[in-house]
């Protein structure tokens, strides 16, 4: 029944029936833990891989001994980095030792290896002042994968791929003649026996003896024209290195370096783990019949007798006593199963070796050698440590290759199984740490080359580590990764939920991943292994659907990069659900039968029903209680955070829920956030983990609270913790970040207590929208096609008002003609335009500005013209005339307006770091209050989105019997066909809850049901169907039928009409085609495309069509004449030849075709080569519009790019219309696309 739950400072009435076992993990630990691992272990691994660097003679030996990140010498804090456009990083210092073997001299030095970007507490990086997130990548795990296809004759053909982390691939395939081929590193295919011979089984007899009798093997041997190991080696060498003279030695070393050299071939820990898992012998012999006695080689004891069935435990015992070949009986044939000879070290070493921390299987022959040669515990441990890379090889070994071939042979006897590439057991996550590690490794290996070269060139006596090491390649590869990798993304900061989701995103794209074009349907589809690991709902619509996913709420990532989800263990003896929680990967989960979390159990954990609904792999079954092994821990463990915030998700169609999840991330933070009346109970957790809210670092008492600072006296030592609050800061997306304290003076706070609310949070709960009184009713056609009718009250009372902050910057540079100057003294500008400019030439804070107003006054020196003799004489007499300057001030762009909230000034004199050539940098921040208006996009949480069609006066809105007018009217037809019934339930429950004064939590898949809602309505005194009589506000008459009315949570999305509305008369033109540019950012025109031309043709509107194709587009002279005619009020002249026609003729001429243009009388029409010839007759210039909108370059993506823009701006700022005649202008250079 409904019960109160405390969420932060608010009490919610919860409808959940299930007791949740286990806590949700910290929602951004994916980022934090991974980066942490990188700093602690990942960096060390890379240095270990590269150690030692030797010169070509092997005399000099350079090794990296240790490293530290110098956290004390971080230059700027996170806030300062954002302000100064710098990177939040710490210097990486590495201790390097150089050994000269001839002289035995050792030199040690600490070498600075560049600044290393640090992760902030929120899981982000500050790169060049912009906050970025590194998205985790889902890739195919290294390992062995088997696949099966059926050919025309119906026979099964098996293929395999051996994928390392880096190195050469091996691919096996069978053709319809039963011949097995291998491709080495994507080259042409060879019979597989050639590979077996090259690896050591040279003759036909040896191959058959080792792999056992098999038709496919025999067929392959017949096809194979080599007969000895040497021939096979030469054959492989010819294929891999065509055109080089083959010798046996070079072939041997080629194969060695391709597969058995740890520097070239890396399986990684995951790869080794997956290999041992797949190729272990015990999996293939379990439940098979032994064809010979199986004897323990150490003791001589018979483990399994001939003809006996091998059970699971016996199979594991067989493997762990070092047996690698087992004969089993299949359809009266004997088949030999070969493993890769890895064993569990703990079963063979007679004492405790937990301190060695070996989790993987180890290679048996090496272990046996150690155990045979050493007896006492210490020396065995010492030898194991020494030989760890032989015990757990990082590269593939011969035994692995033999086992893969044997597995391939066994598949046709139904021994082993084929793999599903889309299963999450075969896909792993590369998070920040690993991506960085790979990048760092690339940088170090480039550096290694340089070091080797310097070792040979420089004098070996005086050489120092510092002189050998060039850190450029390392620094460059890190910089490149953070700056331009596909996985390093500009953080989506629209609201706290979008930040959180961005950090939890999983992408299958990026380097080493898939590409949009190649990704088929299977990769994108929902898979049974996604359950509890990846959300089946939240993914973008469009070309990336299914390639970009979101981590589920309870999911964690294990040390190998596989995603795990938690389950409750069911006690095997008495079948009772315990509170033990086990995290399982997808392939572990496949071995068990798992019950649903809402399966009824009593208070002691016993199942109430005899039959239980369970999941087993991809099937949903009903089984007796005795078979259940695990149980889900929560109904919301299968969805992501955004999806878990949709109440009544279970009543929505999946495609609408997808839109709901995605649109919550686009909700703009409002002026006064309001938590939802009907929530799901996860809002608090999401807000606290998103990192936007300040928390108390220590327990204590609040001693001071103001709008921008909170001070807490610590209980431990009486010291004071200060917390600065952010006020009206600009987010990456231009929304407003503003924090408001929620504690009061004297309040006692525990550690981790929230001290303030941020954007879109209310008492620590995420609050993306507003609770609005709405009804499902049509109104005069204003709800047609998802339009929304809203009341003027929402505008008057600022219900949906949001603050948006834009940043504009001006820089004063050195130009060829002298430095630019920021000044109040601007040519041809009246005092009126300078009323808010201070004496430095910069706008004052608090000024109200409109489009075209000056923000920063700036003048640029103009080119000096050649002076005539008279002028020179006058100058000589009257002294130097003031140098010519032109006005290049920063102005408010077209269509923007607001209030200046902040101005930042950076100059060389104050010691600020500025880009080369820049003397002064000014940034102005303009804030706008945007009220809700017609054309804004709004949405509920159930994918019910719409655009505002009309703002109606309050008195005309339909009203309730108690006189309250509705705030929004929605179209009832938006519900049935879209099947998002959740919105109706939300409205009913919202109506009851607002009357009862409750806030409600109805968790997904475990929330209120119909009867609960009816009870609440009854309790609140409403009728059970939730409908009420509604009166027409214009006439006061009741509407014919009763109407569903209630409270719905509605969001205002970041698609605001002010950002989209756009109009142009004249403006910039493209350089080559001379057609208007496109898009609002370029102040472009509307495209009149092919189909639109057909429409005019269909109506025979010849003049309109001619006008559109010429003077409104690219007839350069014609458009100037037309403008002139309009200004003078004359008739519009005949259009000329469009520029694009001239471009076409030039293209044809480039193809060596001589093209002439003829008129009706077959007279050639001369096309003028340049516009200048036409230009003489013109008097008006429309090229420079009055104030040419400077491209408002989004500061968004990369700040480095801004240099390119600025170079262009100086030369291309358009002059004023009145000042110049067209002759002064070189028309070709006009308004080029920046």
From Swiss-Prot:
Enzyme class of the recorded protein, top EC level: transferase
Gene Ontology molecular function: any one: DNA-directed RNA polymerase activity
Composition bias type Acidic residues, residue spans: 1171-1180, 1191-1234
Region (Disordered): 1169-1234
Any one GO BP annotation for this protein: DNA-templated transcription
Cellular component per GO, a single term: DNA-directed RNA polymerase complex
InterPro entries: DNA-dir_RNA_pol_bsu_ext_1_sf, DNA-dir_RNA_pol_bsu_external_1, DNA-dir_RNA_pol_su2, DNA-dir_RNAP_su2_dom, DNA-dir_RNAP_su2_hyb_sf, RNA_pol_bsu_bac, RNA_pol_bsu_CS, RNA_pol_bsu_protrusion
Keyword Transferase: yes
Keyword Transferase assigned: yes
Family annotation (CDD domains): RNA_pol_B_RPB2
Keywords, sorted A to Z: DNA-directed RNA polymerase, Nucleotidyltransferase, Transcription, Transferase
Record's catalysed reaction(s): RNA(n) + a ribonucleoside 5'-triphosphate = RNA(n+1) + diphosphate
Superkingdom of origin: Bacteria
Entry EC number(s): 2.7.7.6
Stretches of the chain forming a coiled coil according to its record: none
Pfam family name, one: RNA_pol_Rpb2_45
Family classification: Belongs to the RNA polymerase beta chain family.
Function noted in UniProt: DNA-dependent RNA polymerase catalyzes the transcription of DNA into RNA using the four ribonucleoside triphosphates as substrates.
Subunit and interaction comment: The RNAP catalytic core consists of 2 alpha, 1 beta, 1 beta' and 1 omega subunit. When a sigma factor is associated with the core the holoenzyme is formed, which can initiate transcription.
Full protein name: DNA-directed RNA polymerase subunit beta
Lineage, opening ranks: Bacteria, Bacillati, Bacillota, Clostridia, Eubacteriales
């Amino acid at each position: 029944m409904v019960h109160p739950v405390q969420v932060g400072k608010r009490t919610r009435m919860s409808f959940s029936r299930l007791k949740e076992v286990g806590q949700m993990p910290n929602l951004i630990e994916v980022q934090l833990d991974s980066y942490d691992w990188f700093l602690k272990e990942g960096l060390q691994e890379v240095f270990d891989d590269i150690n030692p660097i030797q010169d070509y003679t092997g005399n000099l030996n350079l090794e990296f001994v240790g490293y530290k990140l110098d956290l004390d010498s971080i230059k700027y804090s996170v806030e300062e980095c954002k302000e100064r456009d710098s990177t939040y990083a710490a210097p990486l210092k590495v201790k390097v030792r150089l050994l000269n073997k001839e002289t035995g001299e050792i030199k040690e030095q600490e070498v600075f290896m560049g600044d290393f970007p640090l992760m902030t507490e929120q899981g982000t990086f500050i790169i060049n002042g912009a906050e970025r997130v590194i998205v985790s990548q889902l890739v195919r795990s290294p390992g062995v994968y088997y696949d099966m296809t059926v050919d025309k004759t119906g026979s099964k053909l098996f293929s395999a791929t051996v994928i390392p982390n880096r190195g050469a691939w091996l691919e096996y395939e069978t053709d319809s003649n039963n011949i097995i081929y291998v491709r080495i590193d994507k080259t042409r295919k060879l019979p597989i026996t050639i590979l077996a011979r090259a690896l050591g089984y040279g003759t036909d007899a040896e191959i058959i003896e080792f792999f056992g009798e098999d038709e496919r093997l025999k067929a392959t041997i017949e096809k194979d024209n080599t007969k000895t190991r040497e021939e096979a080696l030469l054959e492989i060498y010819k294929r891999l290195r065509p055109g080089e003279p083959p010798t046996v030695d070079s072939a041997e070393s080629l194969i060695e370096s391709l597969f058995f050299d740890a520097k070239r071939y890396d399986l990684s820990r995951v790869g080794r783990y997956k290999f041992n898992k797949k190729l272990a012998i015990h999996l293939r012999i379990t439940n098979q019949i032994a064809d010979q006695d199986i004897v323990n080689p150490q003791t001589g004891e018979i483990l399994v007798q001939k003809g006996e069935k091998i059970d699971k435990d016996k199979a594991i015992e067989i493997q762990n006593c070092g047996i690698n070949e087992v004969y089993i009986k299949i359809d009266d044939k004997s088949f030999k199963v070969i493993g890769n000879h890895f064993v569990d070290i703990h079963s063979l070493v007679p004492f405790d070796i937990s301190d060695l921390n070996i989790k993987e299987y180890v290679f048996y022959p090496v272990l046996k050698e150690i155990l045979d040669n050493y007896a006492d515990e210490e020396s065995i441990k010492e030898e194991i440590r020494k030989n760890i890379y032989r015990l757990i090889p990082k590269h593939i070994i011969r035994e692995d290759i033999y086992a893969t071939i044997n597995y391939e042979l066994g598949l046709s006897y139904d021994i082993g199984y084929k793999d599903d590439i889309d299963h999450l057991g075969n896909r792993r996550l590369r998070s920040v740490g690993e991506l960085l590690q790979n990048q760092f490794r690339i940088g170090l290996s480039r550096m290694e080359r340089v070091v080797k070269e310097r070792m040979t060139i420089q004098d070996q006596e005086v050489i120092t580590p510092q002189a050998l090491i060039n850190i450029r390649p390392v620094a460059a590869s890190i910089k490149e990764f953070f700056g331009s990798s596909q996985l390093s993304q500009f953080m989506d900061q629209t609201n706290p939920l979008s930040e959180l989701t961005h950090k939890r995103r999983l992408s299958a794209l990026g380097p080493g991943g898939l590409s949009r074009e190649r990704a088929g349907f299977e990769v994108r589809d929902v898979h049974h292994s996604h359950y509890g690991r990846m959300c089946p709902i939240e993914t973008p619509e469009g070309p990336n659907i299914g390639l970009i996913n979101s981590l589920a709420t309870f999911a964690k990532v294990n040390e190998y990069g596989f995603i795990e989800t938690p389950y409750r263990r069911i006690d095997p003896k008495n079948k009772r659900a315990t509170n033990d929680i086990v995290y399982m990967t997808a392939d572990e989960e496949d071995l068990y039968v798992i019950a649903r979390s809402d399966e009824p159990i009593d208070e002691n954990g016993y199942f109430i029903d005899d039959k239980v609904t369970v999941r087993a792999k991809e099937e949903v079954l009903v089984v007796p209680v005795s078979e259940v092994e695990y149980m889900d821990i929560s109904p919301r463990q299968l969805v992501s955070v955004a999806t878990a915030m949709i109440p009544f998700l279970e009543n929505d169609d999946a495609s609408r829920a997808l839109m709901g999840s995605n649109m919550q991330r686009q909700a703009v933070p409002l002026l006064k956030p309001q938590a939802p009346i009907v929530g799901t109970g996860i809002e608090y957790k999401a807000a606290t983990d998103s990192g936007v809210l300040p928390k108390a670092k220590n327990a204590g008492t609040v001693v001071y609270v103001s709008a921008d600072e909170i001070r807490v006296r610590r209980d431990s030592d009486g010291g004071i913790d200060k917390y600065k609050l952010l006020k009206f800061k600009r987010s990456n997306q231009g929304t407003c970040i503003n924090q408001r304290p929620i504690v009061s003076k004297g309040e006692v706070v525990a550690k981790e207590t929230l001290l303030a609310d941020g954007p879109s949070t209310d008492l620590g709960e995420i609050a993306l929208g507003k609770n609005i009184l709405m009804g499902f009713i049509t109104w005069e056609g204003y709800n047609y096609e998802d339009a929304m009718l809203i009341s003027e009250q929402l505008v008057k009372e600022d219900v949906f008002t949001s603050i948006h902050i834009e940043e504009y910057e001006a820089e004063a540079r050195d130009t060829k003609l002298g430095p630019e100057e920021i000044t109040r003294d601007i040519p041809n500008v009246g005092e009126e335009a300078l009323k808010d400019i201070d004496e430095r030439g910069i706008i004052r804070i608090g000024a109200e500005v409109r489009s075209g107003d000056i923000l920063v006054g700036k003048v640029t020196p103009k080119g000096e013209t050649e002076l005539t003799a008279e002028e020179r004489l006058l100058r000589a007499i009257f002294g130097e005339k003031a140098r010519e300057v032109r006005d290049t001030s920063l102005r408010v762009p077209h269509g923007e307006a607001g209030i200046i909230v902040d101005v930042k000034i950076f100059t060389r004199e104050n010691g600020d770091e500025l880009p080369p050539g820049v003397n002064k940098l000014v940034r102005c921040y303009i804030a706008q209050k945007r009220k809700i208006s017609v054309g804004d996009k709004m949405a509920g949480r159930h994918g019910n989105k719409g655009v505002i069609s009309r703002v109606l006066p309050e008195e005309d809105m339909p009203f309730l019997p108690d006189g309250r007018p509705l705030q929004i009217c929605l179209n009832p037809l938006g519900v049935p066909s879209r099947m998002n019934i959740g919105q109706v339930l939300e409205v009913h429950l919202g109506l009851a809850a607002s009357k009862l004064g409750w806030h409600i939590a109805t968790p997904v898949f475990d929330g209120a049901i119909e009867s609960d809602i009816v009870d609440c309505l009854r309790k609140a005194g409403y009728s059970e169907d939730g409908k009420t009589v509604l009166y027409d506000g214009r006439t006061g008459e009741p509407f014919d039928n009763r109407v569903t009315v209630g409270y719905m949570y509605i969001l205002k999305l970041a698609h605001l009409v002010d950002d989209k509305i756009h109009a142009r008369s004249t403006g910039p033109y493209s350089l080559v085609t001379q057609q208007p540019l496109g898009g609002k950012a370029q102040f472009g025109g509307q495209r009149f495309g092919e189909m639109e031309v057909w429409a005019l043709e269909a109506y025979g509107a010849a003049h309109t069509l001619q006008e559109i194709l010429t003077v409104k587009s690219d007839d350069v002279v014609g458009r100037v004449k037309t403008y002139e005619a309009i200004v003078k009020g004359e008739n519009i002249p005949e259009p000329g030849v469009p520029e694009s026609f001239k471009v076409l003729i030039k293209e044809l001429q480039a193809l060596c075709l001589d093209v002439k243009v003829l008129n009706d009388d077959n007279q050639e029409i001369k096309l003028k080569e340049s516009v200048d010839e036409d230009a003489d007759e013109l008097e008006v210039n429309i090229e420079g519009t009055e104030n040419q909108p400077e491209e408002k370059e989004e500061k968004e993506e990369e700040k480095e790019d801004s240099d390119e823009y600025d170079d262009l701006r100086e030369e291309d700022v358009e002059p004023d219309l009145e000042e110049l005649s067209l002759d002064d202008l070189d028309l070709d250079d006009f308004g080029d696309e920046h």
